[in-house]
């Protein structure tokens, strides 16, 4: 489902988004709203938004934590850091995302999928922000669950 990152969301797209949430098809969403950033030398997500929880509650859908292994170029992370240092709000590093995608050609990455979490179980973790942090920790924990990728010879 397309998401407009630079303005208001078209009402037809917003309606389509809501319709998909009440359907049966799994939906993969990136709750941070942006690609991960290099913070303190570690590639990690920015704080997660809570909209995925609101939609899950409204539709009574389970949440399945997912960790997508991967890394963008050092150039991308440097541009993102420079933009923040300069105080620019416009996400200029997004201009390089197509190039980043095509530079991944031929590379493999792994996707780790966790156990479903019923929304009724999430309420014990506090408010929506605390619940989002709980799901985020579950997703990041998945990276440590599997053996490292075998080295190529």
Features from the language model and the residues they span:
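Non-catalytic C-terminal accessory region of glycerolipid acyltransferases
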Residues: 11-153
């Amino acid at each position: 489902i397309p998401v407009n990152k630079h303005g208001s969301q078209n009402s037809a797209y917003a309606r389509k988004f809501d319709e998909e949430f009440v359907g049966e098809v799994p939906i993969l969403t990136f709750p941070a709203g942006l690609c991960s950033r290099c913070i303190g030398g570690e590639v990690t997500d920015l704080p997660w938004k809570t909209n995925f929880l609101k939609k899950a509650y409204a539709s009574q859908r389970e949440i399945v934590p997912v960790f997508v292994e991967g890394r963008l170029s050092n150039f991308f992370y440097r541009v993102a850091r420079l933009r923040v240092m300069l105080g620019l709000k416009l996400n200029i590093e997004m201009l390089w995302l197509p190039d980043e995608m095509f530079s991944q050609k031929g590379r493999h990455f792994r996707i780790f999928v966790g156990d479903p979490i019923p929304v009724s179980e999430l309420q014990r973790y506090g408010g929506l922000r605390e619940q989002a942090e709980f799901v985020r920790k579950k997703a990041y924990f998945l990276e440590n669950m599997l053996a490292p990728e075998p080295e190529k010879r």
